[in-house]
Amino acid sequence: MTAGKLWGGRFRERTAGLVEEYTESVSYDRALYAQDIAGSKAHARMLARQGVISAGDAGRITEGLEQIRKEIESGEFVWRTEMEDVHMNIESRLTELVGDAGRRLHTGRSRNDQVALDFRLFVSDRIRVWKNLVRGVIAALTAQAHEHKDTLLPGCTHLQAAQPVSLAQHLLAYAWMLRRDYDRLEDCDRRVRICPLGAAALAGTTYPLDPQSVAAELDMYGVFNNSMDAVSDRDFALEAQFCGSLIMAHMSRLCEEIILWANPNFGYIFLPDAYATGSSIMPQKKNPDVAEIMRGKTGRVYGGLMSLLTTLKGLPMTYNRDLQEDKEPFIDTDRTVSASLEIMAGMVEALRFNTRRMENALRAGFLNATELADYLVGKGVPFRDAHHITGNAVALAEDRGKGLEDLTLEEFHSVSDLIGEDVFAVLDYRAAVERRCTHGGTGPASVAAQLAALQQWLSS
């Protein structure tokens, strides 16, 4: 027997040291210790209820597991590479503590369904953390939007000035992105939190197990349907990894705008000192490094998604050791997503906006051109003709170094006799925003409705 290996009965030679180092996972999957202990406690109690082990042994197992939890959390627990992973480390220590009872714990269970359970619980627990952190960013965006309902700035398409919008509308766009992320996480969790215990290695087990009671004890939504699928499925991790990637994509977009708006050529925001750094050579610099790093870390999370997709590609049924490579990318993603969400909430809350600069920027780029086209439509001009006439007016204003609102009535008449004195009220930027009365638009009533909906959701 290979010394120290819980599976070593049929082996006569020791595992090569380099192989142990190469194949171990305890250096990172120890992060799943709490889920492993919770799953083992539930399994032991179920075995006792089903008469597979005695109630006394189940009690000793749960007491031993609780002691191990305390040892781990106090830093006393010794993690051993030769034990390969978190599961074998804990079971080995359990046997040291409670003897034969510890050796009965694995009855009716394989590491295949054990690791599937632990990883599902871990991913689900982290999803619930992400949900709370997403709420924090939405709350920060909503609070800033509430403060800036009346602040206007250029809305852009193609990063070119397009139409005036409220700053609240702009910020709420990100709040709604993250609100969808929250819903995705909630939906994902229903598929993650499914109990695979009882699938054993791949074919089920001969013991009279009760997976439903284990699922209930662990607050899971249900049990597996097919034992082979249960031990080889990593859809749940892939889906959670995608949710994390999309959260980072949305925050990376917001980071990009923070970076742009902090540039003096925009000058829309005053970057908080707590979320900026300086230059080693240029004393005047105040760099948006936090937003840049978050934007960069988005690629790291995407890498985890591609890593898991590639790992799963072409795997035959059922469990394969390739699946050991599912956890490290997700653990890294969790650290990145969790930290990014927490930092983003603080950064958004600390932002100060240069509202005068934003409103002055409205005069560049003919943001009221659509208003002129709509005005002409109101005079009975077909929209395509109105579009053409407005284009001529823009060209005229551009040639004369004016905004549309600065043209004289005589100059307007050179492009259309239908334009009257009332056009000047139409070209006012604030009036343009106030006329956007459709559902979801930048008009005050719509913005107020969006704020109310998000505030109600946040308080629920």
UniProtKB/Swiss-Prot annotation:
Protein location: Cytoplasm
GO MF assignments: argininosuccinate lyase activity
Top class in the EC scheme: lyase
One Pfam family in the UniProt entry: ASL_C2
CC annotations in GO: cytosol
Alphabetical list of PROSITE patterns matching this protein: FUMARATE_LYASES
Main localization, broad class: cytoplasm
Catalytic reaction annotation: 2-(N(omega)-L-arginino)succinate = fumarate + L-arginine
The protein's name: Argininosuccinate lyase
